[in-house]
Amino acid sequence: MKTKIVLAALSVIILLGACKKIDELLTFTVNDQTEIVIESSAPFSLPVEIPTPDITTNSDEEFSNNGTRSDLVKEVYLSNLVLSIKSPEDKTFSFLKSIHIYIRTNDSDEVELAYKDNVNSDAKFINLDLTHERLDKYIKADSYKLRTEVTTRETLTQDVTIVVDMSFKVTADPL
């Protein structure tokens, strides 16, 4: 009787371990990066849109490198979005009151990607709060566009260049 219980428990442990391993094989991260520039002419304490260039995805290659294809992708979520100040070197995020970043493609509606309100940071980088929107159609597209809206808490004396690092968690079926 004890042998049967031990075998049953061992089988459950092996099965759970195998499921976790399969899930790991089907989940991977796609990283994208872009830069935005907040110009010194930006008005103080009013929301301002910051232009961003289109971001070309390398999704077909990324999917292929991870043993899948675009049509096998089940879901994509933003797992991390970090902003870091590139220049000026001595600048921190103390000038920033709030930031909201939106994503869209030519064929898809715009959705909010991440945000941070009441920014209170003397650091050179900040993690934004994520909206947990499903982003499959944006990452599968050839390119997507970000729209950034910022509100500053002080007047800027020089342009501030910010690097936007994004990590997307992709879950897909294998080939």
Where in this protein do the model-derived segments appear?
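Cysteine-clustered segments with highest specificity for TGF-beta superfamily mature ligands
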Residues: A123-D165
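Bacterial signal peptide processing site
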Residues: K20-D23
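C-terminal motif of bacterial Sec signal peptides marking the signal peptidase cleavage site
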Residues: L15-A18
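Sec-dependent signal peptide recognition
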Residues: K2-A9
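Beta-strand-rich interaction/scaffold domains
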Residues: K97-D129, E133-K137
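Post-signal-peptide N-terminal segment of Sec-exported extracytoplasmic proteins
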Residues: E39-K74
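A short beta-strand element within beta-rich, extracytoplasmic domains
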Residues: E75-D90
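Short coil-to-beta strand junction motifs in C2/discoidin
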Residues: V76, T92-I99
